[in-house]
Amino acid sequence: MNKKVNVNKVVVAYSGGLDTSVIIPWLKENYDCEVIAFVADVGQGAEELEGIEAKAIASGASECYVADLKEEMVSEYIFPTLKTGALYEGKYLLGTSMARPIIAKAQVEVARNVGADALCHGCTGKGNDQIRFEGAFAALAPDLHVIAPWREWDLVSREECLDYLAERNIPCTASLTKIYSRDANAWHISTEGGVLEDTWNEPNEDCWAWTVDPEQAPNESETVSIKVEKGAVVAVDGKAMTPYEVVVYLNEKGIKHGVGRIDIVENRLVGMKSRGCYETPGGTIINEALRAVEQLVLDKASFEFREELGIKASHLVYDGRWFTPLCKSILAATEELAQDVNGDVVIKLYKGQATVTQKRSDNSLYSEEFATFGADEVYDQSHAEGFIRLYSLSSRIRALNSK
């Protein structure tokens, strides 16, 4: 294949999987350049990272850098997004989407440090990730070339990729038996492909990688006590934790009880729809806790505004627009709204459900004295009449004019 640009040194986002194992020798052959592998540890698991540096070198990389991004990802990307209440298309807690900007940012930093003049990713031309990576690259390193092999090469199947490596005597642990495409980090794991490609097929047990089947979960419920300060979880079950520690702890609880499963068909940015089974056990529990405290402390107008910001934020994050003025502004607005989101929540975990059973806050606007259905001495119900007449005045005038 002809070179599109002259490249001397490229940093490739490397996962150790089949695609990126092929990309390293392919880059050397087609761009005649030095290839440096960059691995982002975002909590995908020790098994995924074991021996990954040696694997990258064996594939032809001159160096391999591994960056531990777990704590930063949760504290600087996931927790701020949670404050917006973002749920893409009403269900998805954006597990893959939120990991991409920090990976791209760290990849750019490595490129700067080693003097690279190009960046490379292994995203396909059908998905959202190519846009997320390249959108971040454009915002952070517009001077660097971007190489997207899946949009250039003529390899079209796993079999061809395996043959490519075998012809070059490059070791690879991948096989043809892989049916599902999975992406995991500390926050979630996604499963796509296989039986899920037909929306009339019910997900089978292979579609769920982490969580216990809710029907097989313990028959005894379990409660967790969560402390929230300024819209972020700071302690669980009486123990102070970092954001990443919170996620790890609540993942363990949620996995055990089958919490956090969704099976959705979503609108990709590239125009097509895709189906996936997503598991976000700890994140589901955290989200329930934050929304419960918001119910107590946000007034009607603030709550409505936060909901609007959450919808917009979900699309910005999903669409790879993290490094934009609008996303920065929304995060700043929800950070301000979160200043009073302080409180304690108790959540019961039982067979796939995370149910808030108790909540309290020193900033609560809820008043039992005002809200009671019994007798009270603080609320004069006759005052409502004047308010209703003014509130409905425009409707009254419109009706009178139509006669």
UniProtKB/Swiss-Prot annotation:
Coiled coil: none
Reaction equations catalysed: L-citrulline + L-aspartate + ATP = 2-(N(omega)-L-arginino)succinate + AMP + diphosphate + H(+)
Protein location: Cytoplasm
Binding site for L-citrulline: Y92, S97, N128, R132, S181, S190, E266, Y278
Gene Ontology CC entries for this record: cytoplasm
Binding site residues for ATP: A13, Y14, S15, G16, G17, L18, D19, T20, S21, A40, G122
Any GO MF annotation of the entry: ATP binding
EC number, as in UniProt: 6.3.4.5
Keywords: Amino-acid biosynthesis, Arginine biosynthesis, ATP-binding, Cytoplasm, Ligase, Nucleotide-binding
UniProt: L-aspartate binding residues: T124, N128, D129
Entry similarity comment: Belongs to the argininosuccinate synthase family. Type 1 subfamily.
Complexes and interactors: Homotetramer.
Name recorded for this polypeptide: Argininosuccinate synthase
Organism for this UniProt entry: Aliivibrio salmonicida (strain LFI1238) (Vibrio salmonicida (strain LFI1238))
Species lineage: Bacteria, Pseudomonadati, Pseudomonadota, Gammaproteobacteria, Vibrionales
